[in-house]
Amino acid sequence: MSDVIALAKDLIRRPSVTPQDEGCQTLMSERLARLGFVIEPMVFEDTTNLWARRGSEGPLFCFAGHTDVVPAGPLEKWHTPPFEPTIQDGVLYGRGAADMKGSLAAMVVAVERFVAEHPDHKGSIAFLITSDEEGPFINGTVRVIDTLEARNEKIRWCIVGEPSSTHVVGDVVKNGRRGSITGDLLVRGVQGHVAYPHLADNPIHKAAPALTELAATVWDEGNAYFPPTSFQIANIQAGTGASNVIPGELQVQFNFRFSTQLTDMDIRERVQALLDKHGLDYELTWTLSGQPFLTDTGALLEATVAAVAAVNGQQPALLTTGGTSDGRFIAPTGAEVIELGPVNATIHKVNECVKAEDLDLLAEMYQGVLERLLA
C-alpha cells in the first residue's frame, strides 16, 4: 500500500461530517510539523481550520482543501461502511475518498517527497484546510483568509484539491468558477376564497409573467472561459394546502450562476427593474455566495498543465463549469487559483469512490507543480 493510500484511508476512517474535523487536521499537522511547518490552528465558532506554513519568504504556494464531508446517506445502500475505507478491485470506497480526503493525502505526500528532495526550496509552502466547506462556509476558509489579509500574508499560487476530473485524473483543471447569487422573493397578494376572486388578489397569477420573463431572459452570452449566465428557480411555496383558498403570498427562491460578463450588482438591478415593471408588491433579499474568478494565464497554470501532461501524456482541459468552491475566497486576494483533484463521478453519492491508482498519480502531479515553481 502506498503512502498516499495509507493516509487517505486514515483520513476516511474519521467521520468528519460538517463542521466536524474528528482529528483529521491533527493527523495532517503531525506529518507537516516533522517537515518543519509552523502549525497554526484557527478555530472559529464550530469550525476547525488549519494554517500550516514552511518558510517565511515569498512566493507563497498554498494547497487548500477541506476535511469535512457530507453525510453518508442511507447506510444500507453502501456496499461497504462509508467510514471503513475499503479497496475492491483497485477502487477505494469511503465517504470523502474523492471529495476530498484523497486529495489531502496526495498533497501531504507530495510535499513530503518534494521537501526530501529540495529541503532548501525557494519561497514557502502552506496548507489552508477547513472543516466548513460542505456547510454554511461562514467560519472556514473565508475567516482564515481574513486573518491572513489582516497581517498582509499573501498567497501567490493556490491549488484547491476539489475533484475536478471527469473521466481520468487530471483530464480537467478548473481555472476558474462562476459566481453564485441567490434571490429570495416574497410576492404579496390578498388571501380569499377561490369562488370570489374579485375579493382577493392572487400573488401566483401576478408573479407568473415576471417569473416567465426571468426564465426566458438571456443574461449574457458568456465568453471564452465561461458559459452564459444561468437562472434557475429552485423553490416555490404558496397556499394553505386547501383547494378553495387563494394564497395571500408567494415565496420564490432562485439562483444565478454568473460569468465574468456580469457583476452581482448588474443582476440585482436587472431583476429589480423587471419585477417593478410587472407592478408586483414584493420583498427581495439576496445572498451572494461568491464572485466569479478566473486564472487564465500565469506561472501556476503553466506549471499545472505541464505537470499533468508529464504524468498523463496529454494536456488537461481548462474549464470553469460546476459549482462554487473555496477558491472564491482566495482568488480576490490576488492569488492565482486553480483546482486539480480526482474524478468527480461519485462525489456526494452513496458508494463514493476513486481509483486508488489515481491518488498516487495525483500526488505525482502535485509534486510536479512544486518542482516547476519552487525547486
From Swiss-Prot:
Top-rank EC class of the record's enzyme: hydrolase
Pathway listed: Amino-acid biosynthesis; L-lysine biosynthesis via DAP pathway; LL-2,6-diaminopimelate from (S)-tetrahydrodipicolinate (succinylase route): step 3/3
Residue numbers binding Zn(2+) 2: 99, 134, 348
Cofactor notes: Binds 2 Zn(2+) or Co(2+) ions per subunit.
Entry keyword annotation includes Lipid biosynthesis: no
Active site: 68, 133
GO BP: diaminopimelate biosynthetic process; L-arginine biosynthetic process; lysine biosynthetic process via diaminopimelate
Cystine bridges: none
InterPro entries noted in UniProt: ArgE/DapE_CS (IPR001261), Bact_exopeptidase_dim_dom (IPR036264), DapE_proteobac (IPR005941), Peptidase_M20 (IPR002933), Peptidase_M20_dimer (IPR011650), Peptidase_M20A (IPR050072)
E.C. code: 3.5.1.18
PROSITE patterns: ARGE_DAPE_CPG2_2
Catalysed transformations (reactions): N-succinyl-(2S,6S)-2,6-diaminopimelate + H2O = (2S,6S)-2,6-diaminopimelate + succinate
Cofactors (names): Zn(2+); Co(2+)
Origin superkingdom: Bacteria
Classification via Pfam families: M20_dimer, Peptidase_M20
GO molecular function: acetylornithine deacetylase activity; cobalt ion binding; succinyl-diaminopimelate desuccinylase activity; zinc ion binding
Binding partners and assembly: Homodimer.
Membership in a protein family: Belongs to the peptidase M20A family. DapE subfamily.
Function recorded in the entry: Catalyzes the hydrolysis of N-succinyl-L,L-diaminopimelic acid (SDAP), forming succinate and LL-2,6-diaminopimelate (DAP), an intermediate involved in the bacterial biosynthesis of lysine and meso-diaminopimelic acid, an essential component of bacterial cell walls.
Protein name: Succinyl-diaminopimelate desuccinylase
Organism of provenance: Aeromonas salmonicida (strain A449)
